[in-house]
Amino acid sequence: TPAGRLKCELFSDIVPRTSENFRQLCTGEFRPNHVPEGYKNSIFHRIIKDFMCQGGDFINADGTGSRSIYGDKFDDENFTLKHDKAGLLSMANSGPGTNGCQFFITAQPCPFLDGKHVVFGKVVDGLLTLRKMENVPTGANNRPKMAVRITQCGEM
């Protein structure tokens, strides 16, 4: 059952490299070996109610995959933007300079993530959809018990 659409705005004026990585992974423009790679048909593999929904691992679908338009990983662009509200898009990572394809969407302000994760966009339409995603039952490792999938994505 489709949960709905998330319409996002990217902060390309503040974090142009991070925004461009996300944009190309949404549109399918990233084509290593002439085959589109990106978020279409990928899942949100980790959901924690009242915290965030994490997805974007189109490699392994479990949080271990990393790829970007700049190589497997790229540096933190800057930490100008803060995790100060729900609906922010931010890069998931495994430490400094390990950005790839994974991202998360905040469910509430998360100031403890400031200076550690790069905020690069926000949900401008679809916060109700985000709430539906956030309330999907989860099991071990906060993995949703039903697939929360990106069925279509692109640029508007």
UniProtKB/Swiss-Prot annotation:
Transmembrane segments: none
Source organism of this protein record: Mycosarcoma maydis
Entry superkingdom: Eukaryota
Pfam families: Pro_isomerase
Cellular-component GO terms for this entry: cytoplasm; intracellular membrane-bounded organelle; nucleus
InterPro entries named in the record: Cyclophilin-like_dom_sf, Cyclophilin-type_PPIase, Cyclophilin-type_PPIase_CS, Cyclophilin-type_PPIase_dom
Record's keyword annotation contains Transferase: no
Protein name: Peptidyl-prolyl cis-trans isomerase H
